[in-house]
C-alpha cells in the first residue's frame, strides 16, 4: 500500500433549515473510516462549509467528529477565521479535545500584509501546544504566499506543513525542494497526479468522501511506478469531478453519498438545495462512477 497519506475533507450534514445534523456527521465519519479507509479527516474546512458556521457550531462539529473517530485515524481541525479571537478559541478547543493537528486558512478579504499574516499564525499558536498546517488556497483567499514567505512562517516550529490547494506547480516544486521535511498535502483532487510527481506527502480532498478507494489505487500505482495506470485512474476521477462541478458540486456530493447509504443531509444556504434535475444528475454520477 502507498505510503502517501489520504485525508477526506469532512462534510457537515445539515437539515433543511440549516441546523447541524450530528447523526449525519457521525455516519460520514464512520463511512470514511470503515469503507473508505482514509488516513485522516480534515475538519471544518471549505468542504465542511465552516465559513458559514458560528463558533459554537464549529465546536459541535469538531467534538462530534473527534468522538466518532475515537482515535482510529488522524484528525486535522481547521480553525482559521477572520476573527482572530475565534481562531485562537477554536485552536484551544480542538487541542484540548485531543486533535493532533490544526490548520488555518490564510486571513483573507482585507488584503493583509505578510507581516500581519505571520502575526495571525503566531497568535493562533501562541497559547496551544499543537502543530499546524497552513491552508493555502489563493483562488479563494487572494493570498498567494511565496517560497520565502513560507520559509518565514516555518520559523515557528509549530508550523509543520501546508495544505497546498494551488494550481501553481512551479511554486509547489520550489516549496517541496526547499522544505523536504515539511508535510505537504495536495488540496486539488483533480491535480493529484502531477502533485504526486512533485513528491507531495499525500492529499486532502472533498471528492475523497466518494472516491477514496480509486484515489488509493492511483497512489499505489504511482508508488509502484505504473504511471499509465495512475494516469488512467486520474482521468476517471477528473471525469467524475467535471460531472460533479456541472451538477453543483457541494449539494451533489451529499446526494451521491445518499446513494452510498449515508444521509449527509443538505448544504447550508445560500448554497442551493437539490432540484429534481440535480437529483437526477447525482444519480447518473453514482451509476456511472460508483455502482458496482
From Swiss-Prot:
Entry-linked Pfam families: DHDPS
Any one Gene Ontology BP term: carbohydrate metabolic process
Main location: cytoplasm
Keyword Lyase in annotation: yes
List of residues binding aceneuramate: 46-47, 165, 187, 189-190, 206
Entry's Gene Ontology cellular component terms: cytosol
Assembly, per entry: Homotetramer.
Its biological purpose: Catalyzes the reversible aldol cleavage of N-acetylneuraminic acid (sialic acid; Neu5Ac) to form pyruvate and N-acetylmannosamine (ManNAc) via a Schiff base intermediate.
Protein name: N-acetylneuraminate lyase
Lineage of producing organism: Bacteria, Bacillati, Bacillota, Bacilli, Lactobacillales
Amino acid at each position: 500500500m502507498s505510503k502517501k497519506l489520504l485525508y477526506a475533507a469532512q462534510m457537515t450534514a445539515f437539515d433543511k433549515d440549516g441546523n447541524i445534523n450530528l447523526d449525519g456527521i457521525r455516519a460520514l465519519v464512520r463511512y470514511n473510516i470503515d469503507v473508505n479507509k482514509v488516513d485522516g479527516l480534515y475538519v471544518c474546512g471549505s468542504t465542511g462549509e465552516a465559513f458559514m458556521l458560528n463558533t459554537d457550531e464549529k465546536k459541535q462539529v469538531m467534538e462530534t467528529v473527534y468522538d466518532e473517530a475515537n482515535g482510529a485515524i488522524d484528525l486535522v481541525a481547521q480553525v482559521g477565521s477572520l476573527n482572530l479571537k475565534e481562531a485562537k478559541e477554536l485552536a484551544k478547543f480542538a487541542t484540548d479535545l485531543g486533535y493532533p493537528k490544526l490548520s488555518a486558512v490564510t486571513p483573507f478579504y482585507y488584503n493583509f500584509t505578510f507581516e500581519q499574516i505571520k502575526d495571525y499564525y503566531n497568535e493562533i499558536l501562541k497559547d496551544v501546544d499543537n502543530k499546524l498546517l497552513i491552508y493555502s488556497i489563493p483562488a479563494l483567499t487572494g493570498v498567494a504566499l511565496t517560497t520565502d514567505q513560507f520559509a518565514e512562517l516555518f520559523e515557528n516550529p509549530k508550523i509543520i506543513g501546508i495544505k497546498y490547494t494551488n494550481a501553481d506547480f512551479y511554486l509547489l516544486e520550489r516549496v517541496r525542494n526547499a522544505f523536504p521535511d515539511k508535510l505537504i498535502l495536495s488540496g486539488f483532487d483533480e491535480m493529484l497526479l502531477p502533485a504526486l510527481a512533485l513528491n507531495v506527502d499525500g492529499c486532502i480532498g472533498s471528492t475523497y468522501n466518494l472516491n477514496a478507494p480509486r484515489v488509493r489505487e492511483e497512489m499505489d500505482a504511482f508508488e509502484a511506478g505504473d504511471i499509465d495506470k495512475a494516469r488512467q485512474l486520474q482521468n476517471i476521477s477528473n471525469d467524475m469531478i467535471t460531472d460533479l462541478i456541472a451538477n453543483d458540486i457541494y449539494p451533489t456530493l451529499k446526494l451521491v453519498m445518499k446513494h452510498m447509504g449515508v444521509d449527509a443531509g443538505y448544504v447550508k444556504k445560500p448554497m442551493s438545495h437539490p432540484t429534481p434535475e440535480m437529483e437526477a444528475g447525482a444519480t447518473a454520477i453514482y451509476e456511472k462512477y460508483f455502482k458496482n
